[in-house]
Amino acid sequence: MTLDDIKEMIREIPDFPKKGIRFKDITPVLKDAKAFNYSIEMLAKALEGRKFDLIAAPEARGFLFGAPLAFRLGVGFVPVRKPGKLPAETLSYEYELEYGLDSLEIHKDAVVKGQRVVIVDDLLATGGTVYASAKLVESLGGVVDSILFLTELTFLDGRKKLDGYDIISLIKF
């Protein structure tokens, strides 16, 4: 198994979720035990030598890679969720989408001041979701060590939105 094999497994769905979008569907990777395990191993390898305390990931697809990666590396996992999904007191960050505004929330006690956090998501597109996640971590006093993606859509220039952060992506489209 190689990252090229994983890339070939990611299928493109035209006009999803709306016309003109070419959606990168990772579900074939998730359903294949060897491919999914290899993806987690390669994400773990990308973080070798780094010192951090937590992995944070935005819902929903960030959870698919962030939680197993945290388990694999023996660190805690912090979910970053849509409004109203977390039960305790939260902090919120509003961000712009192509078609309006959205927001994400994190528990106020999810990160202790000075903790180093890696943010994990499945895909870097425009960067808005992980930017909001990073701002939430920082607002709690955490330090964003790096932002890690399985895939990146380079033509959308999401790295520009994340300027100043250490960005790692394993597969580029």
Curated annotation (Swiss-Prot):
The keyword Glycosyltransferase applies. Homodimer. Pathway: Purine metabolism; AMP biosynthesis via salvage pathway; AMP from adenine: step 1/1. NCBIfam families: apt (TIGR01090), PRK02304.1-2 (NF002633), PRK02304.1-3 (NF002634), PRK02304.1-5 (NF002636). One of its GO terms (cellular component) is cytoplasm. GO terms for biological process: adenine salvage; AMP salvage; purine ribonucleoside salvage. GO terms for molecular function: adenine binding; adenine phosphoribosyltransferase activity; AMP binding. The gene is apt. It is found in: Cytoplasm. CDD domains: PRTases_typeI (cd06223). Belongs to the purine/pyrimidine phosphoribosyltransferase family. SUPFAM superfamilies: PRTase-like (SSF53271). Its EC number is 2.4.2.7. It catalyses: AMP + diphosphate = 5-phospho-alpha-D-ribose 1-diphosphate + adenine. This is Adenine phosphoribosyltransferase. It holds the Pfam family Pribosyltran. Catalyzes a salvage reaction resulting in the formation of AMP, that is energically less costly than de novo synthesis. The keyword GTP-binding does not apply. It is an enzyme of class 2 (transferase). Transmembrane segments: none annotated. Keywords: Cytoplasm, Glycosyltransferase, Purine salvage, Transferase.
